[in-house]
Regions:
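Repeated loop/turn-to-beta-strand initiation elements of outer-membrane beta-barrel proteins
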Residues: 26-28, 62-65, 111-114, 169-175, ...
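Transmembrane beta-strand segments of Gram-negative outer membrane beta-barrel proteins
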Residues: 21-39, 63-67, 136-137, 143, ...
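Residues on the lipid-exposed face of transmembrane beta-strands in outer-membrane beta-barrel proteins
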Residues: 53-57, 102-106, 161-165, 203-209, ...
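Residues that define the transmembrane beta-barrel architecture of outer-membrane proteins
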Residues: 36-38, 45-51, 96-100, 155-159, ...
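Detector for outer-membrane/organellar transmembrane beta-barrel domains
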Residues: 207-303, 314
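Outer-membrane beta-barrel pore domains and translocons
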Residues: 31-37, 70-72, 119-121, 178-180, ...
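Outer membrane beta-barrel
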Residues: 52, 56-180, 273-282, 286-288, ...
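Outer-membrane beta-barrel "beta-signal"
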Residues: 339-355
Length: 355
């Protein structure tokens, strides 16, 4: 596997010798979020902050360097001990710098792309328009990933290879292989050690159909497979396989607004894992009123070894300007131990020429 990784990187570098040099182009983006959380049942509060900086630098023909780093800071801790997660920007540990991506991307024509380097699963697979509206962590990456594997989901990164192929218009094939253990420690991120860390692979087939509205109809089926260290004995590598799917189906138009059905689910082939399965369903309406607000409701349910959890989220995203937005959200959580209601208020600032 190590030889394959080195070989693909060498192929990317070799492509420069056969391509004409182009003037570098630099794209950048900066995202800052601050979020207040309030557990209305027990009165606990928390303040969460997130900063993300990304850059894309054009190199030779068809090639670019992609980089992204984040900083996280929170005060008050988690407002409850649920596994689904109320916030997709919350991290337990405060860190001023986490490198999430540092990779080389090479396109071969308009239909085949290869990226090699430090990467993140969330950015590669889970950034669709409908799921991206919601604040819950389960909509940012599926619980069967973050709870069953020590892989590169927020806020971690891992060395890997990511492939994308578009054989026909609307159809996208993706496949990735990552180091089996991800990290946010700079000294451990740039390692590919299948013998000790194992490997993790994920892939999917997606098909999009254009519609009259802003968002296309999208259908995705994917798999996950990992041979990663056991949670009981880190020296033992265990094989775990699962499957996941995502549906984003526009239902109707109301003026310029579009009503979209969201459906997602995942299941593991083994039952003796932390998270055996997950499903979610909801509705999203975009381009509401003059400032193009987006509103949605979603219900997420997780089958966890210690007990099932269900989270119902209602949220609305309001643009105040082209770069400033506010988003309140309400979560009603049915926990295997207790129930609670929590509110979030998120303010976001987005700048850059590559948004």
């Amino acid at each position: 596997m190590y030889r394959i990784l080195v070989g693909l990187v060498a192929c990317l570098c070799g492509a420069s010798a056969m391509s004409q040099t182009q003037a570098p182009r630099v794209g950048w983006n900066l995202t800052a979020m601050t979020e207040g959380q309030w557990n209305m049942t027990n009165g606990k509060t928390s303040w969460v902050n997130y900063l993300e900086a990304g850059v894309e630098v054009g190199l030779w023909k068809g090639a670019a360097f992609e980089g992204m780093a984040i900083a996280t800071w929170q005060a008050g801790g988690a407002v409850d001990d649920d596994n689904l997660g109320l916030s997709n920007i919350y991290a337990d540990e405060n860190k001023p710098f986490r490198l999430m991506q540092a990779s080389l991307r090479q396109s071969f024509g308009e239909r085949f792309f290869v990226s090699a380097g430090l990467r993140n699963v969330d950015a590669d697979y889970f950034t669709t328009p409908a799921t991206g509206l919601f604040t819950g962590a389960a909509d940012a990456d599926y619980p069967i990933l973050s709870l069953n594997y020590p892989l590169a989901t927020f806020p971690l990164g891992a060395i890997g290879i990511h492939l994308e192929y578009l054989p026909i218009d609307g159809l996208t094939l993706k496949a990735s292989v990552y180091n089996g253990v991800a990290s946010d420690d700079f000294n451990r991120q740039f390692r590919f050690c299948p013998s000790s860390d194992g490997v993790f692979s994920i892939g999917c087939v997606s098909y999009e159909i254009p519609t009259k509205g802003e968002q296309a109809a999208s259908y995705t089926l994917g798999y996950v497979h990992g041979k990663t260290p056991s949670s009981d004995d880190g020296s033992v590598l265990e094989r775990e396989t699962g499957f996941w799917g995502l549906l984003e189906q526009p239902l109707a138009m109301f003026g310029k607004s579009q009503l979209i059905l969201l459906g997602q689910g995942a299941a593991m082939t083994r039952c003796d894992v932390a998270c055996k399965g997950y499903w979610g369903g909801g509705l999203v309406m975009n381009r509401i009123a003059r400032n193009d607000m987006t509103a949605g409701i979603v219900c997420n349910h997780m089958h966890f070894a210690e007990g099932d959890e269900t989270d119902i989220e209602c949220t609305i995203h309001c643009h105040l300007t082209s770069w400033l937005s506010v988003q309140p959200a309400l979560h009603v959580m049915h926990h295997h131990k207790h129930n609670f209601v929590a509110g979030l208020l998120r303010v976001s600032l987005e700048l850059g020429n590559n948004r």
